[in-house]
Amino acid sequence: MNLRSASPADAELVAKLGRDSFIAAFGHLYSAADLASFLAANHAPGIVAAQLADPAMRCRIAEDAGAPLGFCKLMLRPAWPEHGAARFAIELKQLYCAAGTTGRGTGAALMDWALAEARGVGADAVRLSVWSENTGAQKFYARYGFTHLADIDFWVGSQRDDEYLYELRLN
């Protein structure tokens, strides 16, 4: 497995991987209209290209023999400042792995990169949101020391989901 930096030229790849991963994991939970609205707002190539061009965004793509396995986006701006006491909490925006790649170490490699990057920019905390019923992801984050910080809302189209805000304090 190889991790490489993403650039705006990777927007279509990251957008497709994001769309496909979200649909595989959660698509069955939403109406077609809500899902389409969410995907257009979050996983359209133009949206992703703008994110990847943002100097405050860091993104790594995991590949195996050129085949994409996953990606991780880290936003180097304060995340959810209304919660917690961290001085500089940044957001782990997305950590998505392709369907069928669970257990291959992709998520762990991307998380290790994200935490090293966060420490490298002087963050004292990393925050992320996770669906309240996604116990698999919650267990993954707990293994790294993330803890529940707050309950927040997450919108997929017009559907509100209960989401947990997790935080990892960095030493």
Where are these regions (language model features)?
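Short glycine-rich hinge loops at helix-strand junctions in the catalytic core
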Residues: 105, 122, 145
